[in-house]
Amino acid sequence: MLEFRFCRALCDIARNIEAQLKFNQVASPTMSFTDPLAQLNISPATITHRGLREYAEVAELVLVEMGADGREHRLTPAAAAAWQALKAAALANGITLIIVSNFRSVQRQAEIIQAKLAAGQLIDDILRSVAPPGHSEHHTGCAVDIASPDHPTLDISFAQTAAFAWLTQQAGRFGFTLSFPEGNSAGYQFEPWHWCFQC
């Protein structure tokens, strides 16, 4: 009986280790940057022409908060601490900030583009608002897409909100910058919701 319990305990430990390894695998680079680009017919010339940086997937993530939809929002430890401080300061000024999107794997980035292609969108149009896999700040675990309760969707009109006005004035104190202002050199549309902690 004792031997059976010992074997069962070992099996439980092995299952826990396997689950942890699978989780870590999600948060570490498993694909070369060229593979997903080729699969999506994204030309290397497009990347070069726009001067897009490569971003590797971060290895260490922590749970920041749970979204209203039940999704886990994860960032690097430093970005998570900065986000909590930013969010608390905003709240003290009557501004509620919500994370809509955060860490995203290379594979997930490719899936987003694939879904848009399947819906009939052209790749050049997609790449005005979605970074190619391997070139998204979301891979770093330092980028957040931010909304507010009165403006929960990610669109350009977020720039007209009190939340955006507050972020524009205060986010820099917490290490966050607006990644894609109007006329940005990377060629993305204006994204008032996309802010990145300078890790």
Regions found by a protein language model. Give the residues of each.
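Extracytoplasmic cell-surface/polysaccharide-interacting catalytic and binding patches
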Residues: M1-N102, V106-C199
